[in-house]
From Swiss-Prot:
Residues 889-898 have a biased composition (Polar residues). Its cofactor is pyridoxal 5'-phosphate. Residues 280-296 have a biased composition (Basic and acidic residues). Pathway: Catecholamine biosynthesis; dopamine biosynthesis; dopamine from L-tyrosine: step 2/2. Residues 250-296, 861-905 are annotated as: Disordered. The modification N6-(pyridoxal phosphate)lysine is found at K648. It catalyses: L-dopa + H(+) = dopamine + CO2; 5-hydroxy-L-tryptophan + H(+) = serotonin + CO2. InterPro entries: Aromatic_deC, PyrdxlP-dep_de-COase, PyrdxlP-dep_Trfase, PyrdxlP-dep_Trfase_major, PyrdxlP-dep_Trfase_small. Pfam families: Pyridoxal_deC. This is Probable aromatic-L-amino-acid decarboxylase. The gene is hdl-1. The keyword Lyase applies. GO terms for cellular component: cytoplasm.
Length: 905
């Protein structure tokens, strides 16, 4: 080494090990040494290695002390051709920098003689270095030419060269580092490190730099070393090669193996104990004897993963004791019949076939079934035994009881005329995915518990985000993105999670302005806002009560849309009262009237006052897959978070709500767990396999088929809207954009409640209700994939029939209270007799002058408490002229019966 190089401080890669080694004799007198320890599980398919599939790095000093932790925050294993994001943290758990490669950027060019041999002549790769605030401070460009060697250039955002690293084609172990003025700064080398045993050695990457080097340059050294290790020293074939002698394998670039005390025991075959016959030796004994002709050498075992940390800087878990593992031969078939959880494999196969056959028959006959059950609450208690069985029962008996006891009490959401709620489509592909997910039986606590499903969730969120054309700030993998998506169990949980995240962020910002403020004082002044959509406002109020903040419900316009001037006036009024606005919940096709708030008006108001804008698109969010619907998302760039439930619009059986945030770090701060393995999730630690079902759904149908299904859903909604608008007896109460129609009969709330009950009582249709601007309306959601125009026509005819049956009783029903209405509808036929109905609810004579409701109520009250006919000298009250004495009660009439009491429309 030159004189200039002798003055450098050598930094070597050291790993923790029990046996102390005299490093001074090996490497000379070193001070302030730092090194990189790269751990990687190369045998994740081996059963012994499955629980150690995480790839983390550490930076050590000469005294074997950890000075930096480098965490793989992408929840993906590091590969040469894959994206990664490495987060550098010091020993105090504070972020120092990030190394980000969003996706491999390689160009393979075959020119000249290289094309004849089929080799790559030019390879390029790029990695960004970010500070703890997410700002790019440098970008490294690796250029590998097969004939000229490796060159790494690190530049700042302005394009100025910070450091340059170069190695010739034949120089595989040393990379010279120079500054912007070509001044020699140090070297990056691949070094051999002894583990304390003369036969056990491993390799690592070491950085040498002078004492004058600043912290930023050290970070650049670190970034370049990781890029070299991943792109150059980490060839798979070289990694798996045996490491026998350090001298012969010095230039063979392989990943550093762990020290001796962390190595995986070599798999050995247990010697079967057999009695030896005279003159014969068992085959097992022959195989177990070492070969006398071959010299026994210590082979490099399978590379083991680093010791797992529950948290950075925490105590390391002790490794399990080394045990001899019997070699498994996959070619041998298991012949014995093994009971798995009380059922053999053949029994499960037969039972699964019966269940599938039953589901297919049920799906074929779904139109003949009732949409909703005709049962009273508590019916199942009388049918099931009071105590659990002591002994196991046959699966056939269980399936039979399911058909007889459970199915009659089910609401068939896949029925073509089930329009009450949002039916989850029973796609066969998603049912298969649900079966696979149930067999996995893994809740997915964090990456190490279930790597595949954790990574699949992150990827599916980006798939859906790109399909819906969400802003790139909401996606995880674009360059320098701080956003991302995660899956929650419901939209209510998503709303609560972002509410807590906004609360935490506002408290942090207020404390930065004035450190004297206490969290409790700030919390008492926080106020959130949402619109007066009844169902959603109730959910948001509950979330606000749990989060211990105030929730203010704002009025909407005639189209149930929250406007920007309304929000601005409310915020200014609360600021004058000393409150702190921090959260605004906007509607984007939610569950009530399917209204779309003007985000382009709400966004600037929220940005002006520093409030969190959350967009709840529980129902209509997935419709953004269709390009023609995206005009409704004007102003989505102002949003801080966005959530939707795919199962409410598409045919996926997805029991998840997809939540995207602009800054995932704020969501992590609000989470109960802040483990590096965890994606930025919310309250639940465990997670179902919703990502697996979404993956099956997207691949099975494709984006085009999903778009066609949404368009058909919207078309049927418009068809039903036109039918209702042509009928003068009904009025449509919302602006129908999707397939959700809110309508009511042109009468008061009591009559519409009776009409809704009568329609649902038939079992041929299922409708729901909601309250819009203090009016009771009937809510019809067309969402079943089996629904057609013929089904809508039959549902409309049924509604008209029930309306005609109730029309003669309209004036009586309108003056009833809730208790009287329930009695009128639900009580036996005795209450519904013509004389009893006429006595309790007298009809209005249309020939008499119009009376007020008070007069009608007074007359009804007098008739209610009059003496019975047998005890009074007066005859019973005779109905006024126009009374229909032969009118039968609604419960005793059928749609096909002759209606003799129809009134003129």
């Amino acid at each position: 080494m030159s004189e200039k190089g002798e003055t450098l401080i050598e930094d070597t890669a050291e790993i923790e090990f029990e046996q102390t080694v005299d490093k001074t004799q090996q490497w000379g007198r070193l001070k302030n040494a730092a090194a990189f320890s790269l751990f990687r599980d190369l045998h994740m398919n081996e059963s012994l290695q499955r629980k150690h599939a995480r790839s983390d790095y550490k930076v050590y000093d000469l005294n074997n002390r950890v000075i930096f932790h480098v965490i793989n925050t992408t929840a993906m294993p590091i590969t040469k051709d894959g994206p990664f994001c490495l987060k550098v943290m010091n020993k105090d758990k504070k972020s120092v920098a990030k190394f980000l490669r969003n996706e491999p950027k390689r160009s393979y060019k075959q020119t000249g003689l290289a094309s004849l041999f089929g080799c790559c002549s030019d390879t390029e790769d790029t990695m960004e270095v970010l500070d703890d605030n997410g700002l790019i401070i440098a970008t490294s460009f690796l250029h590998h030419d097969q004939f000229r060697g490796i060159l790494i250039t690190m530049k700042d955002p302005a394009g100025k060269v910070l450091i340059g690293i170069q190695a010739s084609r034949d120089q595989k172990d040393v990379f010279a580092v120079s500054g912007p003025d070509n001044r020699y700064l140090g070297e990056i080398r691949q070094k051999i490190i002894s583990s304390g045993n003369s036969t056990d050695n491993y390799k690592g990457v070491a950085c040498w730099f002078s004492t004058e080097v600043s912290l930023n340059v050290k970070v650049f050294f670190m970034a370049a070393a990781f890029l070299i290790e991943i792109d150059y020293f980490s060839e798979t074939k070289s990694r798996q090669a045996p490491f026998r002698t350090p001298e012969a394998d010095y230039l063979n670039p392989i990943i550093k193996t762990p020290p001796h005390n962390e190595r995986v025991p070599k798999m050995k075959t247990n010697i079967s104990k057999t009695r030896k016959k005279k003159g014969k030796v068992s085959d097992a004994s022959k195989d177990s004897r070492p070969s006398e002709t071959k010299k026994e050498t210590l082979m490099m075992p399978e590379i083991h993963h680093t010791k797992h940390f529950d948290s950075i800087g925490g105590e390391e878990q002790a490794f399990a004791k080394k045990e001899k593992v019997e070699e498994f031969k996959p070619t041998e078939a298991v012949k014995e019949e093994v009971d798995v959880n009380g059922m053999s494999r053949d029994q499960f196969r037969n039972a699964a076939k019966k269940v599938v056959d039953y589901l297919m028959k049920q799906d074929e006959s779904i139109r003949a079934a009732r949409c909703s059950p005709a049962l009273k609450p508590g019916y199942l208690k009388a049918l099931l035994p009071p105590k659990a069985p002591q002994k196991a029962e046959d699966i056939d008996d269980i399936l039979e009881d399911y058909h007889k006891l459970i199915v009659p009490g089910l609401s068939h959401s896949s029925h073509p005329n089930f329009h009450s709620f949002y039916p989850a489509g029973n796609s066969f592909h998603c049912l298969l995915a649900d079966l696979l997910g149930g067999h996995i039986g893994d809740a997915g606590f964090y990456w190490t518990s279930n790597p595949a499903l954790t990574e699949l969730e992150v990827l599916m969120m980006d798939w859906l985000g790109e399909m819906m054309a969400l802003p790139k700030e909401f996606l995880l993998f674009p360059e320098a993105s701080r956003g991302g998506g995660c899956m929650q169990r419901s939209d209510t949980e998503s709303n609560f999670l972002v509410l807590v995240a906004a609360r935490t962020d506002m408290i942090r910002r207020m404390k930065q302005r004035d450190k004297r403020l206490r969290s409790s004082d700030i919390l008492a002044r926080l106020v959130a806002y949402t619109s007066s959509d009844a169902r959603r406002s109730i959910k948001m109020k509950m979330a606000a009560e749990v989060a211990m903040v105030k929730m203010r419900v704002l009025p909407t316009d005639q189209n149930f849309i929250l406007r920007g001037d309304t929000l601005h006036a409310a915020i200014m009024a609360d600021i004058e009262r000393g409150l702190i606005p921090f959260f605004v919940g906007a509607n984007f096709g939610t569950s009530g009237p399917c209204s779309f708030d003007h985000l382009h008006e709400l966004g600037p108001v929220c940005r002006e006052h520093g409030t969190w804008l959350h967009v709840d698109a529980a129902y209509a969010g997935t419709a953004l897959i269709c390009p023609e619907i995206r005009g409704l998302m004007r102003g989505i760039d102002w949003a801080d978070s966005f959530c939707t439930t795919p199962s409410k619009l598409i045919i996926a059986v997805c029991d998840v709500c997809c939540l995207w945030v602009r800054d995932r770090h704020k969501l992590q701060h609000a989470s109960l767990e802040n483990h590096p393995d965890l994606p930025f999730k919310g309250l639940p630690t465990s997670q179902r396999v919703g990502a697996l079902k979404i993956w099956f759904m997207i691949r099975s149908f494709g984006v085009e088929n999903l778009q066609n299904q949404i368009r058909e859903h919207i078309r049927l909604g418009q068809v039903m809207t036109k039918i209702l608008q042509k009928d003068l007896r009904f009025e449509v109460c919302n602006k129908v954009v999707m397939g959700l129609i809110c309508f009511r009969a042109k009468s008061n709330d009591m009559f519409n409640k009776a009409l809704l009950y009568r329609c649902n009582e038939t079992g041929n249709v299922s409708l729901a209700s909601c309250v819009l601007q203090n009016k009771f309306v009937i809510r019809m959601c067309i969402n079943s994939p089996k629904c057609s125009e013929e089904d809508l026509d039959s549902a409309y005819k049924l509604i008209c029939n029930e309306y005609d049956i109730l029309k003669p009783f309209q004036y009586r029903i309108e003056v009833m209270n809730q208790a009287e209405l329930e009695t009128f509808i639900r009580d036996p036929a005795k209450i519904h007799s013509s004389a009893e109905v006429s006595r309790r609810f007298p009809v209005v004579n249309p020939l008499e002058p119009c009376r007020s409701l008070a007069q009608i109520s007074s007359q009804m009250h007098t008739a209610e408490y009059a003496d019975p006919p047998g005890k009074s000298n007066k005859s019973p009250q005779v109905a006024a002229k126009g009374e229909l004495p032969s009118a039968a009660p609604p419960s005793s009439r059928t749609p096909n019966s002759d209606i003799s009491e129809k009134s003129d429309r």
